[in-house]
Amino acid sequence: MQIFIRISLFLQEYIINRISDMNNLPKIGKYNFVAEPFHCDFTKHLFIGHLGNNLLNAADFHSNDRGYGVNYLNSVNKTWVLSRLSVELDKIPAIYEDFVVETWIDSVMRYFTNRNFKITNKDGYVYGYGKSIWAMIDTTTRQPVDILKTSNETISEYLEADYANPIKKSSRVKLDDDLKLQQSILTTYSDIDINGHVNSIKYIEHILDLFPIEYYKKYRIKKFDIAYIMESHNNDKL
């Protein structure tokens, strides 16, 4: 009985401290990264795909720390999925360069939430910004679920609508009528993530691979917009 009481008191204290820590967290999260050499291309700058992974990692850290991330959601058969991503870059971090990703949510609706990113070096020089739209789905039915209800309104406590992000609100990605098929890609093991579908950054990498390397000797990516319409899975053809 004495041992049980001690364990109960310990758990109670842990929960209280955890809630206190969450309540003291800022609305904007800041996370440090390094442009490691094996994540850089032949120009000695970070691969766009790896920068995208850093943005998603920052989003994951931010949401998990505040109680509405994948760690909690998976326990109730839910998860986050990326619906839209827009990134504008004035510069890409160079090899061995330290950089910071800031992230925050400026609004939340029933089925979608808007997440922002700011990428700087350690001295505050701004490399670029990002805007994204996320949905929450049931991992069994794959259908959207009520974000506010699932997060017990916790997400609403961390909204930051006043922090500047100069990127314009995402609009519908328009496609020309005369587009021609450039390549078909069969999805394989390394494309599939923890949600059992093609990872959102893998689409970006596949698109960038459509351009010859000579293109990247002359130009660099300054802006991209991508909309995720439906899930793809292993052995699907893109």
Give the ranges of each region predicted by the language model.
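Hot-dog-fold acyl-thioester-processing enzymes
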Residues: 19-82, 127-131, 138-223
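Hydrophobic beta-sheet segments that form the core/acyl-binding groove
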Residues: 85-123, 224-238
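N-terminal amphipathic/basic-hydrophobic helices that include classical n-h-c signal peptides
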Residues: 1-21
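Short secondary-structure boundary segments
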Residues: 7, 62, 70-108, 196-199
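A subset of signal/propeptide-processing and intrinsically disordered low-complexity segments
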Residues: 9-12, 16, 116, 133, ...
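Hydrophobic transmembrane signal anchors and adjacent membrane-proximal interface regions, especially
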Residues: 3-5, 124, 221
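Short non-domain terminal segments
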Residues: 1-2, 8-9, 31, 201, ...
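Hydrophobic, ordered structural segments
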Residues: 118-120, 134-139
